[in-house]
């Protein structure tokens, strides 16, 4: 039998389980993720001018992303509850898209990584943007949600290479 990548959440009987991280060393863990919401140029202008019916789209989406990162273990069944030390969500306009680009970073000192927290922050920020602007543009597209980098832990550091939009 070949040795290679394996699914850590599946036991020898093929059953899903939560990984035991009790014996792992505590290290600083940082992960970054990104995504985008593509929309019509006039929808982007509406958001940037602060004229969306539901209010401050970017500010609300930023807070939603931060709140979501803190709730990841309640949303994804096998994620450990974590004591995050920092979560940031940055949302910037991109006229070339056109739309908004979302980047999130999650950090802690602990025994397991924060990739899912960063990805959850981006996902929920994107969904919040869609929710708040859907009255103006139901054809918005959410995409490109992916891990950009992670550091810390036994598996080492990772940085996504090349532009893969």
From Swiss-Prot:
Substrate binds at residues 78-80, 116-117. One of its GO terms (molecular function) is cyclic pyranopterin monophosphate synthase activity. Gene3D superfamilies: Molybdopterin cofactor biosynthesis C (MoaC) domain. The keyword Cell membrane does not apply. Signal peptide: none annotated. Belongs to the MoaC family. This is Cyclic pyranopterin monophosphate synthase. Its EC number is 4.6.1.17. The gene is moaC. The keyword Lyase applies. NCBIfam families: moaC (TIGR00581), PRK09364.1 (NF006870). GO terms for biological process: Mo-molybdopterin cofactor biosynthetic process. Keywords: Lyase, Molybdenum cofactor biosynthesis. Homohexamer; trimer of dimers.
């Amino acid at each position: 039998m070949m040795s290679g990548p394996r699914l850590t959440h599946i036991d020898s009987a093929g059953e899903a389980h939560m990984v035991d991280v009790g014996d792992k060393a505590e290290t600083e863990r940082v992960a970054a993720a990104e995504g985008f919401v593509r929309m019509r140029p006039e929808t982007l202008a509406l958001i940037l001018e602060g004229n969306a019916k539901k209010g401050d789209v970017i500010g609300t989406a930023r807070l939603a992303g931060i709140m979501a990162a803190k709730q990841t273990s309640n949303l994804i069944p096998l994620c450990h509850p974590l004591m995050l030390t920092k979560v940031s969500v940055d949302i910037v306009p991109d006229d070339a898209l056109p739309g908004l680009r979302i980047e999130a970073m999650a950090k802690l000192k602990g025994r397991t990584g924060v990739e899912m927290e960063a990805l959850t922050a981006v996902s929920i920020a994107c969904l919040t943007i869609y929710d708040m602007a859907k009255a103006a543009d139901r054809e918005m597209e959410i995409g490109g949600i992916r891990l950009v980098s992670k550091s810390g832990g036994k598996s080492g550091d990772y940085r996504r290479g090349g532009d893969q939009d």
